[in-house]
Amino acid sequence: MDYEKNVTLKEKSHAELSVKIKKSDVQESYKKLLNKYSKELQIPGFRKGKVPVSVLETKYGDAIKGDLAGDLIEESLKEIFESLDEYERPLPYSYPELNEKPELKVEEDFSFTVHYDVFPKVEIKKTEGFTIEVPEASVSEKDIKKELERLQERNALVTACKEGTSAEKDHIATIDYCELDDEGKTISGTERKDFVFTIGSGLNIYKIDDDIVGMKKGESKEITKTFPEDDSNKDLAGKTKKIKVTLTALKYKDLPALDDDFAQDINEKYKNLDELKADIKKKFEISVEEKIKSLQKNALTEQMVKEHTIDLPESMVRAELESRWMMMANQFRTTPEELEKMFGKGPQSKAALLEGWREDSEKTLKERVLIETLLKEKNIEVSDDEIEAEYVRLSERMDIALDELKKYYSNPREKEYLSEGLKEEKLFKALYEKSTIKKGKKLTFDELLKD
């Protein structure tokens, strides 16, 4: 197809593409379309395939020209976009739109203009000479003990307490409860049966843990509680409630002993408790290493972004917000459409939530754009040998058979993720060498990972 094109880059990573298709191509395409319709259309008074072109033009001329305009736009854009560089072609989620409906005249060149969003073009300025502070952390015996206790809890047997046992902290209570009015009658809609919680956890609406202590199975009790003005539950803040509670069941957790048998019950690969402890320590140390690496990368990226102008197109921001909404729907195990119905309208509507996420989404996108630009500018690649070495490292680190790991990464998409991650590691390794990394505050394992 013979055409002229011109791309103009505008603000907010927006582009306009003007196209002029030569009249010779317009006329040739018009003739082909007329011939096609003359063979396919059946008009009263004419045999199928024998409709004169002049009749077609008289009866369907405008419609045929409209179809031709659409075909020419589609064909030319496909060809043009394949020839443009990545900073001039549209983003996958930015569909080109016509500035105005073009008029097609068979005897003239056909011109039209479309606009769309493109990948932000960033002029790289400062990427070195920064000072970043990264916290320190280590794994203590206390951290390992805490994890062992968590495993104990997870593997505990829940057993009913003997009749007549008084409720204590850490017992598992099953209660029926309701609110009472001034006359001691049940307030409709406040009843709840078979509510289960661990005494001392505070995981109950009225925070009645201490009031349950001492009660026995089958016993009922009326509790009056006044809640502070700043209570986290706005429905209770500053109010006094009278609650009737009946303890219907009382159980306790029978924790397994921390011994070699316990370790083997967790996983047969552990011969004794010491091996389990060593594995916990190894996994925690990996978590510390990965977290510190992530904090270091984020700290440098954040400083670099401040030194650059990055114009994000609205379609890119919108796509990121919709992606987060979809992830939220997956967490709720529902569809994005159903999630929107669940939240309804008002301060917690989809629109309100997305607007609340906008600032963080834009920050994340700017970081991604800058990193991607640096990877391209520095032409960073990874070799097959580097990927193989990473397979071995991950196999040892994750305690997974090498063949099994390679099978997972035989999926092209997963292998691409791995490759991109290695490229980023190479990029940041080079960037760190040209900046100063200072040791920051010493944190505990829990403090480091709390986010």
UniProtKB/Swiss-Prot annotation:
Q: Where is the PPIase FKBP-type domain?
A: 170-256
Q: List the disulfide bonds.
A: none
Compartment list: Cytoplasm
Kindly give the Pfam families that the UniProt entry links to this protein.
FKBP_C (PF00254), Trigger_C (PF05698), Trigger_N (PF05697)
GO process annotations (BP):
'de novo' cotranslational protein folding; cell division; chaperone-mediated protein folding; protein transport; protein unfolding
Q: Per the record, what is one GO cellular component?
A: cytoplasm
Q: Which InterPro entries match?
A: PPIase_dom_sf, PPIase_FKBP_dom, Trig_fac, Trigger_fac_C, Trigger_fac_C_sf, Trigger_fac_ribosome-bd_bac, Trigger_fac_ribosome-bd_sf, Trigger_fact/SurA_dom_sf
Task: Report the main location listed first in the record.
Answer: cytoplasm
Record has Chloroplast as a keyword = no
What name does the UniProt record give this protein? Trigger factor
In its UniProt entry, the species of origin is given as Treponema denticola (strain ATCC 35405 / DSM 14222 / CIP 103919 / JCM 8153 / KCTC 15104)
Q: Which gene encodes it?
A: tig
